[in-house]
Amino acid sequence: MKTFTAKPETVKRDWFVVDAAGQTLGRLATEIASRLRGKHKPEYTPHVDTGDYIVVINAEQVRVTGAKTSDKMYYSHSGFPGGIKSINFEKLIAKAPERVIETAVKGMLPKNPLGRDMYRKLKVYKGANHPHTAQQPQELKI
């Protein structure tokens, strides 16, 4: 019996909607990253994108444990000397709540072209509304 390898053109991708309200950031991000990779499917193949589309709503209501609200820092650099910028979780969740979940999930995906394709299947919205109702996403409990 030969080893099964999924073909990119035969992969069936479903759409799921995840409510982030009251969820812990890390636990939510690990489950989302796993589903974006397709590890929950029996036909998972490491070198083929077998994952599903994930729509995350209520991103501004995600929570972190302990003192991470004020202590967790997000860094970015302009590329110029002295161009490092930092912002803590509390300010970032007020400014751009989508980026908190996107950053957490992106760090859990492969750092290569396949990982970038997986990341493009993640859609994050700060409110309860999203423009993907035409895809009829299924509710996913995490």
Swiss-Prot record:
| Annotated GO MF terms | mRNA binding; structural constituent of ribosome
| Annotated InterPro entries | Ribosomal_uL13 (IPR005822), Ribosomal_uL13_bac-type (IPR005823), Ribosomal_uL13_CS (IPR023563), Ribosomal_uL13_sf (IPR036899)
Q: Which UniProt keywords apply?
A: Ribonucleoprotein, Ribosomal protein
Q: Name one Pfam family in it.
A: Ribosomal_L13
Q: Cross-referenced PANTHER family, in alphabetical order? A: LARGE RIBOSOMAL SUBUNIT PROTEIN UL13M (PTHR11545:SF2), RIBOSOMAL PROTEIN L13 (PTHR11545)
Family, similarity comment: Belongs to the universal ribosomal protein uL13 family.
What is the protein's name according to its record? Large ribosomal subunit protein uL13
Q: What is the lineage of its organism?
A: Bacteria, Pseudomonadati, Pseudomonadota, Gammaproteobacteria, Pseudomonadales
Gene from which the chain derives: rplM
